[in-house]
């Protein structure tokens, strides 16, 4: 067992790093609490190590209080502390967003001989607590509400209506942006639940919400923020003895409005030459923006995820790359330079740096 040998108080620190000749170490840094450093580092080498890490990998030191919080046009976008939920605020109006519930996932496990009880009560209880804490006017389910892709499993006729019937008693205003698992979802939902098109919805002319399995609708190209699910991002930590810990994560990355516009135009079968942003403005009346893109973790924490700190050869099969969706595959979102955060606001670093550290 590795024992802590150094206590170091600070606002924030680099959290995960590996030198070529040394094992990986994990540092945690809640505000105004000590940081315990595990391993064989000497006290005198700590600051030098941090400096080398920062210079070698261009890693940034994050302000814990503001980690993951974005503000523009009177709109605030911030993860709910310690939860896989995103809170949007605009002039006193609050909207809560969650993604990837995958209700009925237990049925797939049962077909494989693994029997677990229904997760609907547990997910409802978790969501009820978040709703009580955040008090939103609207709840948006950002795709993959159910698990079966193109059909409705027999058990889903029980699980999904049961979930929604209980949900609308907690919060009456609920909207769904369908994902690739949400075929034939509408018959399972109450009439009061609004089901949007799968290419997304826009809030306050600033926030575009889409699941991520398909190109967003043209109006989303003008948003300052894009929010998507679908990927189920996780990070995998491994200690020197080979034990692995998997943690869900947020990813925040910049989108290239021009590339995104070109992809949407091709999806719309629109012929154009030259500047795609100009064509989008002419065809749809939308001024294309380079948005901040937030990739959400799955709300159902029993699901697996894509290890963003593994390279494609080790952690991502060709099938998983297909599951990334057209936006990420196209390079319209700079995923490699995206910033990864844990649920407590811990800044892990850029995705490409985390992959290099994991090699």
Language-model-derived ranges and their functions:
Residues 18, 40-42, 52:
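Basic polycationic patches enriched in arginine
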Residues 4, 8, 33:
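Cationic, low-complexity basic patches in intrinsically disordered or flexible, solvent-exposed regions
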Residues 44-359:
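Extended recognition/assembly regions associated with phosphoester-bond processing machinery
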Residues 1, 20, 35-37:
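Short hydrophobic transmembrane-like helices used for membrane targeting/insertion
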Residues 15, 30-32:
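Compositionally biased, low-complexity intrinsically disordered regions
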